[in-house]
Amino acid sequence: MTILENIRQPRDLKALPEEQLHELSEEIRQFLVHAVTRTGGHLGPNLGVVELTIALHRVFESPVDRILWDTGHQSYVHKLLTGRQDFSKLRGKGGLSGYPSREESEHDVIENSHASTALGWADGLAKARRVQGEKGHVVAVIGGRALTGGMAWEALNNIAAAKDQPLIIVVNDNERSYAPTIGGLANHLATLRTTDGYEKVLAWGKDVLLRTPIVGHPLYEALHGAKKGFKDAFAPQGMFEDLGLKYVGPIDGHDIGAVESALRRAKRFHGPVLVHCLTVKGRGYEPALAHEEDHFHTVGVMDPLTCEPLSPTDGPSWTSVFGDEIVRIGAEREDIVAITAAMLHPVGLARFADRFPDRVWDVGIAEQHAAVSAAGLATGGLHPVVAVYATFLNRAFDQLLMDVALHRCGVTFVLDRAGVTGVDGASHNGMWDMSVLQVVPGLRIAAPRDADHVRAQLREAVAVDDAPTLIRFPKESVGPRIPALDRVGGLDVLHRDERPEVLLVAVGVMAQVCLQTAELLRARGIGCTVVDPRWVKPVDPVLPPLAAEHRLVAVVEDNSRAAGVGSAVALALGDADVDVPVRRFGIPEQFLAHARRGEVLADIGLTPVEIAGRIGASLPVREEPAEEQPA
């Protein structure tokens, strides 16, 4: 049996002699490479936190001590050390989540996987324990990149204000190529004032502040001015301690002994402490280290030796179609600029950045700032394209409403991973945008059904300069081209039977599902018209009179049923005095468990068979004319 196989709970880890810890680290890395390449998942981040996670569980008493993982994609090692070693169905239906999960273990606390939130959670948990007289430590592990999020600094400000509140912040800094000098630094927890890496660590602190929206630059200037001329002008020690936080580090995050010593020192301090650990993303796996883009942040199913993908691809992804088209548009229009929030590659803007480096900005974990900055860019005469994951736009709703829409700014939002994303679980599904954004005056929302319409509707969107526009598309590969038979107003007619009784309104990617549904209904003697509204907000004015020609309207969307496109269509029909019932098919008002997209859609009834069955059962009974009675 391996050392790892004998670890069933954190106390088993504490019993290990120090000389076995290095061997355990290697076993964990081998396990991760073989397991994650079989299922897909976050590989690079977890390879980088092996020793750090071991040290955390040797020093603290989870779950009495609460260990919080910001974002949570680096929690695989934590799962292994807390009794969850069956990774055979990682991120699959019935298997382990790719993020912490309270349903899985009492050792997990935060499962939302949205960055920069852990420090706020830690602040609240620590205060709750103090109020209720409970013992135990609260430890928040946050990445250096997540410190660019404004929420993290709001939390730091409040944490620092409670000077007698024991709370430990571990910064997992894996975004720099430098490493601390080992020896006196690691063993004695000294500062870097006398080491060769001193200036680099100062640059880290300066960089974090200067990339932090709104408060970062003034805070940096204030600290610089207060200590100007002193040897430690930009020292992380000075920055964080001026905020009221004890600073320990930087520590070699791959030296278990050094990390344990730092954590024990922090544990003894009766107040907030920040422990700065330097780690290497992808450590121990050469292909990850050699991967310049993101050190295998996320991988699909692949051969661990050759790194060749083993899962078949069905063509280009929605993201790549957008990425190619925005480059073409950028070449035609010098006013087109782009913004993203720490997602340059995932949202398809890498090629745009290569081609137009002075016209793209990665603002960090700062969706709110992205939206407001876009309003400024638009007011200044440019047309910004803000590309983010659909689930993360929730953070910028107020800014989209009050800064972009209220001022009628020509900003285009591009939402990647819209609808059901599947294996990434509850917090990554982009299933709320078409509901939340229905209330934004002047906003136009496009839901393309295929690659051609991503290109066409993106061009239509960036042509609008007096109001915000939004285009949304899902994850994974684009399906086949879906041609239109006709155009009625702004609607594309995709299917029309001779005597249609049902009007199927297909929202974006659900067009193929609706076409298959129409075939099933036709086999049952029920004729259909299938239309793609293309722009789902506002409702096209030709839709109500078209609906009046049918006995039932069914709206099928990859979005919440609550207040979504179906609700907007029903409202439009009511306003037009069209008395035709509307059936809404969408995502129920619940959080969705992780599974493949097709499995999730089947579970919630968004399949052709299920939709056709429910439409057939709910179609109003046709009233036959009464027969005349003989005289």
Curated annotation (Swiss-Prot):
It catalyses: D-glyceraldehyde 3-phosphate + pyruvate + H(+) = 1-deoxy-D-xylulose 5-phosphate + CO2. This is 1-deoxy-D-xylulose-5-phosphate synthase. Catalyzes the acyloin condensation reaction between C atoms 2 and 3 of pyruvate and glyceraldehyde 3-phosphate to yield 1-deoxy-D-xylulose-5-phosphate (DXP). Belongs to the transketolase family. DXPS subfamily. GO terms for biological process: 1-deoxy-D-xylulose 5-phosphate biosynthetic process; isopentenyl diphosphate biosynthetic process, methylerythritol 4-phosphate pathway; terpenoid biosynthetic process; thiamine biosynthetic process. Pathway: Metabolic intermediate biosynthesis; 1-deoxy-D-xylulose 5-phosphate biosynthesis; 1-deoxy-D-xylulose 5-phosphate from D-glyceraldehyde 3-phosphate and pyruvate: step 1/1. Thiamine diphosphate binds at H73, S113, H114, A115, N174, Y285, E367. The lineage of its organism: Bacteria, Bacillati, Actinomycetota, Actinomycetes, Kitasatosporales. Pfam families: DXP_synthase_N, Transket_pyr, Transketolase_C. It comes from the Bacteria. Keywords: Isoprene biosynthesis, Magnesium, Metal-binding, Thiamine biosynthesis, Thiamine pyrophosphate, Transferase. It is an enzyme of class 2 (transferase).
